[in-house]
């Protein structure tokens, strides 16, 4: 027996979920105050906890990623891939171009600009094995970067997106993190169990968004300081930048998905394509083509080995593993709640196979091309043209490394200005979608594809802004980075429950197909 919502002909109006809202608001306020008032103690404490988690649960993170990869492959290539996320009469709300643009924009964020140059160069100079700065180190650096930005992370988004979309649109449960646990807990998901899951999802999402806002602010400030050296790089500049970014992000959230986030995603993708094409054509084009082919081959040939590699027999490399691979797996897991929920929100009417392949392959291809082109351009300058200054800058100020790279290409002042604009737009989409999902999780009622009241979206946007400014001014940004990684551990358990619950529901459906129900939806949003 599925949720009693199946029997309802109309949906109740959207209203605040007091338990989820207040528990989340109070929790993030306490965390924020601790980080602001005691920045050094918070940093030391979280760093110690993170080290213990990495040491004790590194193997566990690896297994969760591998299990997720296998499960998502089964979703895509078995008969269950034909099952739609919705009823037979449901059609996709967004066309393929807009849909794929939103998939990409929500899942990537500004980190692609931050790490596109910095990560490959860092691996090249400080590899886990062997000597840095060599030809072998260059080849392995790109392979490691492909690993961290490759399909391992995207399957987590696909898993959460498909699972939430299935239970929301196929089983008529709320579009909330709790709903995927219905096969395990039954009607108890509408009580304390569900409130706790949604509340933790909000906390993890806010911490992730604050971290994203911090990265965005650092890149923006670096770009503005690069373009205008006389502009003072002070706390006031940082605060003004954060407020401006969040004002526009709030506006897109208020406008909604159709008019705000969808439009931004299209602009975002076009700007990124233009920048990628510019670097490809004005850089060492033939070298970059060779690099893309070879990097892809290296990634595929080491795929299985590196998916399981814990550097058991090389203790010197375990620190690198914790700082990079385990960090990335935990980061992807921590981002999965809100990105997956957003993917579910925009994927009603599409089949499971469509969503899995769309999420895992379309953004993946662009991401790997970006890492390859920017990374190989930077490494080529260091390895073959003696521009060690790029490497030094990556170690000292990674946010500035992209702007330094552009100096070796034509029209660099103008392109640097465009990068600042791209940075601003690229920041907006994940923050906008994340804020919308937080507001939806802290409300109840309405249909599965309706959104929360505008005032609730504005509230969470303001809360994220205040927490971000406080943390950045207190110098606690690195503490927040540690916190977002730690959020990955408890949510990884929820991912395992998601796989079990979805497999159970799909098995039941293949044996006894879902009876289509026609409901009259009463909109309570906007």
Swiss-Prot record:
Ranges that cross the membrane: 18-38, 57-77, 94-114, 149-169, 201-221, 237-257, 273-293, 324-344, 355-375, 418-438, 458-478, 483-503
* Phenotype upon gene inactivation: Mutant is impaired in osmo-independent choline uptake activity. The betT1/betT2 double mutant is completely impaired in choline transport.
Gene Ontology CC, one term = plasma membrane
Q: Which Pfam families match?
A: BCCT (PF02028)
UniProt keyword Oxidoreductase present:
no
Topology with respect to the bilayer: Multi-pass membrane protein
Q: What is its main location?
A: membrane
Which family, according to UniProt?
Answer: Belongs to the BCCT transporter (TC 2.A.15) family.
Q: Where in the cell is it found?
A: Cell inner membrane
Q: Which UniProt keywords apply?
A: Cell inner membrane, Cell membrane, Membrane, Transmembrane, Transmembrane helix, Transport
Q: Which organism is it from?
A: Acinetobacter baylyi (strain ATCC 33305 / BD413 / ADP1)
Q: Which residues lie on this side of the membrane: Periplasmic?
A: 39-56, 115-148, 222-236, 294-323, 376-417, 479-482
| Physiological role | Sodium-independent high-affinity choline uptake system. Uptake is not proton coupled. May play a role in metabolic adaptation to choline-containing environments.
The question of whether Flavoprotein is a record keyword is answered with no
Report what the protein is called. Answer: Osmo-independent choline transporter BetT1
Q: Which residues lie on this side of the membrane: Cytoplasmic?
A: 1-17, 78-93, 170-200, 258-272, 345-354, 439-457, 504-526
MF terms from GO for this chain are: transmembrane transporter activity
User: Sorted alphabetically, which PROSITE patterns does this protein's record hold?
Assistant: BCCT
């Amino acid at each position: 027996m599925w949720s009693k919502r199946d029997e309802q002909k109309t949906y109740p109006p959207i209203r605040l979920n007091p338990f989820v809202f207040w528990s989340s608001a109070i929790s993030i306020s306490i965390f924020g105050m601790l980080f602001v008032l005691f920045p050094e103690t918070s940093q030391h404490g979280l760093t110690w906890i993170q080290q213990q988690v990495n040491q004790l649960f590194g193997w566990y993170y690896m297994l969760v990623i591998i299990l997720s990869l296998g499960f998502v492959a089964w979703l895509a290539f078995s008969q269950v891939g034909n099952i739609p996320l919705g009823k037979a009469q449901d059609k996709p709300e967004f066309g393929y171009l807009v849909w794929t643009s939103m998939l990409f924009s929500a899942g990537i964020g500004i980190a692609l600009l931050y790490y596109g140059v910095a990560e490959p160069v860092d691996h090249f100079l400080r590899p886990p094995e062997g000597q840095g700065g060599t030809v072998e180190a260059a080849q392995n650096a790109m392979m490691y970067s492909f690993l961290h930005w490759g399909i391992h992370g995207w399957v987590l988004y696909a898993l959460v997106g498909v699972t939430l979309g299935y239970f929301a649109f196929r089983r008529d449960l709320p579009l909330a993190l709790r709903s995927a646990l219905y096969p395990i807990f039954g009607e108890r998901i509408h009580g304390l169990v569900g409130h706790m899951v949604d509340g933790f999802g909000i906390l993890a999402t806010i911490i992730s968004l604050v971290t994203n806002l911090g990265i965005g602010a650092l890149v923006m400030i670096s770009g503005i300081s690069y373009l205008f050296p006389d502009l003072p790089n002070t706390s006031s500049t940082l605060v003004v930048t954060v407020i401006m970014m969040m004002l526009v992000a709030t506006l897109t959230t208020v406008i909604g998905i159709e008019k705000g986030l969808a439009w931004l995603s299209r602009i975002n993708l076009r700007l990124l394509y233009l920048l990628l094409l510019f670097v490809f054509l004005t850089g060492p084009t033939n070298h970059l083509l060779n690099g893309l082919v070879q990097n892809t081959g290296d990634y595929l040939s080491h795929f299985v080995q590196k998916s399981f590699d814990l550097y058991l027999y090389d203790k010197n490399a375990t620190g690198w593993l914790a700082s990079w691979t385990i960090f990335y797996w935990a980061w992807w897991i921590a981002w999965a709640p809100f990105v997956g929920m957003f993917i579910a929100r925009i994927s009603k009417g599409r089949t499971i196979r469509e969503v899995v392949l769309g999420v895992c392959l379309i953004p993946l291809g662009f991401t790997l091309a970006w890492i390859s082109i920017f990374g190989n351009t930077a490494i080529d300058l260091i390895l073959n043209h003696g521009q060690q200054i790029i490497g030094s800058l990556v170690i000292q100020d990674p946010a500035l490394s992209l702007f330094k790279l552009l100096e070796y290409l034509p029209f660099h002042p103008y392109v640097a200005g465009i990068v600042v604009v791209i940075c601003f737009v690229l920041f907006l989409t994940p923050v906008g979608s994340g804020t919308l999902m937080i507001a939806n999780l802290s409300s109840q009622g309405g249909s599965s594809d309706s959104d929360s009241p505008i005032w609730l979206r504005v509230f969470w946007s303001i809360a994220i802004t205040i927490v971000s400014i406080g943390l950045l001014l207190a110098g606690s940004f690195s503490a927040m980075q540690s916190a977002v990684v730690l959020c990955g551990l408890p949510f990884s358990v929820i991912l395992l429950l998601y796989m079990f619950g979805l497999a159970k529901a799909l098995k039941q459906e293949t044996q006894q197909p879902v009876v289509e129900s026609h409901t009259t939806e009463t909109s309570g949003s906007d």
